[in-house]
Each structure stands twice: as structure tokens, then as C-alpha cells.
Amino acid sequence: AMARLDMSTGRPTVIPSVPAGLTLDVVLAQGAGFANDVLARAHSDYCRKVGLNYRRTFSKRMVPGALCAALDECLERGTDGVIVQPLDHPTVRDAVARLTDAGVPVIGILTDLPSSTRLAYVGLDNRAAGRAAGLLLGRLCNVPGDVALFTAGGLYLSHEEREAGFRSVLRDNFQHINILTSLTGGDDPQRNYEMTRDLLRMNDNLRAICNVGGANRGIEKALLEAGKRDDITYCAFNRTPLTRQGLLSGLFDVVIHQDMSLAARTSIDLIVQHFEGKVPIAVTIPTELIMVENLP
């Protein structure tokens, strides 16, 4: 807000800033893990701080139709801006276009939808983050063997980019490591548990695991049941209570992290800047490499 002099009274009058009273919708994946819960709370806290109305929707995980329905509902009930964790699917691009055609700015968060009409993207440089994970595992695994890569699935562009970066570094620099076919668990702990359990039963040459998505507790459960806690080098994404404890116990070797509070604040700021007439740009959240010795 700013103040100007009311010439009729001689007293200053407070004029609300452009974003006062705006309603923002945040649409995230349901059940995707602790990191998404942190992101949702950070959005709520920051909206309250800057005086914006906040509505949150958790859409069924990895289901484009459910995400489209959630975005269409935002449009139908009236919204001034949408921050969404998008799925890379044509129907989602169309839903984003319906919002922007109606004058509603859309920000992609954590994962991008670059061929859409979204206003900007906020999140990691996911290919660089994947390359960092590959470099770390390559240097930590000095014995020839196999590496397993877990993803939520191809509908998250962020996971595809992380996988591409991970594979490129290992392929070019660590020929003693064989990367197995990716395991797609949909960020579901039970599926990740079953795939890890079966992998450990069938493969005596497994040296490392990298999970570029969520549901680490399923992988952790299988490793502990098999007595493999100290035998497998393990890289995960996003610092959570589980991954933090895993670092302390020695189960995890490194966690690739992004500051969810910073991502939330930045995405909201971009919406506000849009209404202030500024041109928003994509904002890359710094990639943090966390090991037990620098654990916050």
C-alpha cells in the first residue's frame, strides 16, 4: 500500500497496492509426500503475510484428468492466479490455456510445462540437479556394479530431466557403473517397496540407488528388511524428516534439496508482479547438496 494526500481533508489516505484482495489457487499433487505438504503450508503462510486470499487443492496424483478438473474448477469459481504442479500432458496444457485465455496467470512450480501458455516456472534446474546426483554417486561408487533409478513417471517433466542428467553424467564419466532400466513407482511407497524388494532378490550386483521422486520410505523399508543399509549408496531428493533421519542413520548418503519456502514465496511474487505490470521470468531455485556433515 501507499499513501497520498487527500486534498479535501488534508489527511493522508492509504491506497491498497495492486494485489490487495487477490485470490490465488494452488493446485498440487495429492499424497506426493512431505515436501508437497511443506510447499502448501509455505504458500498459505506467505499469502497471509502479504494479504492475499489463498485456496489449496490437492489433485489425484499422476492423473491428468483429475488435474484438468481441478484447474477448470479454479476458473469456474473465479480466481486471480493459479500456481500448479503440472503434468506434462496435452489435456493439462489445454486446461492451462483456458485459464490464460480468461486472463488468469498460471505459474508452474517444481516441474515445468514449457510448451504451454503458463506465465513462468519456479523450481530447480532439474537436469543440472540430476547431473549433480550422477556425479556424486559415480564418485561414491568406486566398485563396478549396477545403479537403480526410481522415478514417479514420465508425466513429471522434472523427473525426466533429472533422469536425463543423471544418466548422461554416469554414461560419459563412470563407465564402470551400469544404469538399470528406470523403475516407475508413481511416488507410491508400497510400489517402491515392492520394486526394491524384488530388485534386491534378483540382483546381487546392485551398488547404488537414486530416487528422483518421492516415497523414499518404501525403498528404505525394503533395504532395511534385506539388511542392505550399509551396502547400497543412496541418493534421494528433498530433505524431509525421513531423509534427514536417513542421513543421520547412514542409510542415505546425499539428498538433493530445494527450498520449498523460497519456491512458494517466489511463485506468489511472480503473480503479484504480473498484476503490477511487471514481466515475470522463470526463477531457478538453487540446488542444495545435503550430506550428514552439513545437515540443517
Kindly label every feature range from the protein language model.
Residues 90-128, 240-248:
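Flexible loop/hinge segments that line or gate small-molecule binding clefts
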